[in-house]
Amino acid sequence: MKSLRLALLMLAVVSAAPAAEVADCHLVAGWEQQGSARRFTADNLFEYIDGNAEGYLLYGFVQMQGVTCQSGGESILVDVFEMTDADSAYGVFTANLDPSLPIQKVGMGGQIMPRRALFCKDKYYVQLAANPEKGQMAALRAFVREAEKRIPGRSLPPAALSWFPTEKLASVRLIPESVLGLRLLKRGFVAHYELGQAFVVIEASPESAAAVLSKLRQRFGEAAPAQVADEAFQADDQYLGGMCIFRKGRYIGGFANMPNPKDATAQAASLAEHIPGM
């Protein structure tokens, strides 16, 4: 038992190390820490971001470490959120980004603005906020550059992003639960287009994916079979419009909110072609 506790303690220390190294005002010369460092877990995150903590918890929040840095009369808050995995970190990033601005190549993705910067790398999401009285883009850029160097691990965005057809694609986000408002689709990527939306959910196995698809088919009473991937159905729903949902191995995907099921099926077939086989 003593060995187990020691192992868990060592694991926690190793896990927290990158966050502690990034939450450091000395990343950039001329900046000093103001006040005490911040650390929050799932049990008390609401004390720091009351009203929005649930959004982080849904993505698999583990812990947060942060500091307030000061240089002269200027200040920057640096907060490092550790998530359960890299996809979850990317999900939090896309939930917080400015959709009107492009995603920059920082880690798996980032944005640097005059008063705010954010990026994700591996299982960490980093958010910086400058004094709102004055833009500090140069300082934010310097902090982001040094912070990104101190986080090891994955710098590539989730592979699923490349599966969605790019024509007239507006955005792609990781939805932590109830994809398309359907509880059976617990977590997945949703792509918004000028017309309609697509999704991909990754199940544990082809068998579990088949079970989910079967339940979805029963939910849409007038569903008809469709020739897409391993199995599929199409339907015309009151809320989701023309739709087609398919299974390819352990992946469930499809298109919804199309003018009719035929159009949805054609788009779903294009999506299925880009999803890797098992």
Please state what every model-predicted region is.
Residues 5-15:
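Bacterial N-terminal signal peptides
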Residues 16-23:
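Boundary at the C-terminal end of the N-terminal hydrophobic targeting segment
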Residues 1-2:
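N-terminal secretory signal peptides that target proteins for export/translocation
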Residues 126-181:
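A surface/extracellular/periplasmic glyco- and lipid-processing/surface-interacting theme
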